[in-house]
């Protein structure tokens, strides 16, 4: 199905300027919640300093509480008529123009492993994380799945047609396993 879409020249549902979007931020695996928070504070400072932005709200640690290296920022922009003309723009930027700028700039902040931006006007058509296009790779062999997923991601990246390419498969997250001595605990 992916290759059939090459011939489609228009979007089924074009993005809308709703003056709101989400950024999903990731620091390196094994980062503490404190170090992730410190990096997110830098991202908040960048966003808050932008004259196009009305409000910034951040949540560190993921919504399940177990993703210490993940965060989300909810960005509310000023209404289109109230947005100033500010560098690097030569006009009042649309939400989509600003999103492209933010994606590039947030990925430059030290400590950010990945900054993806989600346009909420397109999120209602997805089954999983809310992006306009998502793929699910399934099978019984985890190693093969990881290899296939990374090969698919490499092809998507090299095409230059897609942004925010990511996987929710994270190999290498440090963990501690505790096995209680039931006899001693009794």
Predicted regions and their residues:
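Acidic, Ser/Thr
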Residues: 26
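Acidic helix-start/capping segments at beta-turn-to-alpha-helix junctions
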Residues: 62-65
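Surface-exposed amphipathic alpha-helical segments in non-transmembrane regions
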Residues: 2-7, 22, 35-58, 69-174, ...
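Alpha-helical transmembrane signal-anchor/signal-peptide segments
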Residues: 11-23
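Active-site acidic-Proline motif in GNAT/NAT acetyltransferases
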Residues: 29-30, 182
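A generic structural micro-feature
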Residues: 15-17, 67, 127
């Amino acid at each position: 199905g992916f290759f059939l879409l090459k011939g489609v020249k228009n979007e089924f549902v074009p993005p809308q300027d709703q003056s709101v979007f989400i950024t999903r931020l990731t620091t390196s695996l094994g980062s503490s919640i404190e170090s992730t928070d410190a990096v997110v504070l830098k991202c908040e400072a960048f966003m808050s300093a932008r004259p196009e932005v009305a409000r910034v709200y951040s949540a560190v640690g993921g919504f399940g509480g177990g993703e210490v290296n993940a965060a989300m920022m909810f960005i509310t922009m000023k209404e289109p008529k109230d947005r100033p003309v500010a560098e690097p723009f030569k006009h009042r930027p649309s939400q989509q123009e600003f999103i492209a700028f933010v994606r590039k700039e947030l990925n430059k902040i030290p400590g950010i492993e990945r900054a993806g931006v989600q346009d909420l006007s397109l999120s209602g058509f997805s089954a999983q994380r809310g992006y306009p296009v998502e793929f699910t790779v399934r099978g019984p062999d985890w190693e093969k799945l990881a290899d296939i997923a990374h090969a698919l991601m490499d092809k998507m990246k090299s095409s230059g047609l897609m942004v925010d390419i990511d996987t929710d498969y994270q190999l290498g997250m440090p963990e501690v396993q505790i096995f209680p001595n039931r006899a001693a605990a009794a």
